[in-house]
């Protein structure tokens, strides 16, 4: 049980750290250029470049990722906000995983699928991040909806049960 408790905290911290770090990188010219081919070929996002310039699109993603990370980090005190942040993270990772289809993530020199290209290798990890975001969503949803007495709650939920 202690290992599970530690692992859950590590998953949440890791997700928050990644969202903060990758979000902060979106404010650099290098990252704005790096995501351009992904966004340009996406059926869900390509329209953004018709409205905004390269850096603005990247900055929008950065603000979104950092905000989601902050909301997820607030789970112990504001689980309702963590639900929203986790939902944004789930949508973010579903979108980035769609890049595997819209920008082929397979290496043609190695025969294509299942040989991952550099971009494909970078994106495939988002399956784990998606799973983590879904887990944080479920945990925050459960914490938000505690209707039973604090005695029935998990130890970390008891701590914050009277603050809601």
Predicted ranges, named:
Residues 1-164:
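Membrane-interface extramembranous regions
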């Amino acid at each position: 049980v202690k290992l599970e408790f530690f692992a859950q905290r590590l998953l949440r911290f890791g997700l928050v750290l990644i969202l903060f770090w990758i979000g902060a990188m979106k404010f650099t010219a290098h990252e704005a250029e790096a995501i351009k081919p992904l966004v340009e070929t996406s059926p869900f996002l390509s329209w953004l470049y018709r409205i905004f310039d390269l850096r603005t699109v990247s900055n929008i993603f950065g603000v979104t990722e950092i905000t989601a990370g902050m909301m997820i980090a607030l789970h112990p005190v504001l689980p309702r906000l963590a639900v929203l942040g986790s939902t944004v993270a789930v949508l973010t990772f579903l979108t980035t995983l769609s890049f595997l289809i819209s920008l082929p993530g397979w290496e043609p020199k190695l025969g294509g699928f299942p040989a991952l290209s550099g971009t494909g290798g970078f994106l495939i990890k988002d399956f784990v991040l998606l799973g983590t975001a879904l887990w944080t969503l479920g945990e925050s949803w459960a914490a938000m909806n505690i209707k039973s007495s604090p005695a029935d709650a998990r130890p970390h939920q008891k701590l914050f049960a009277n603050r809601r």
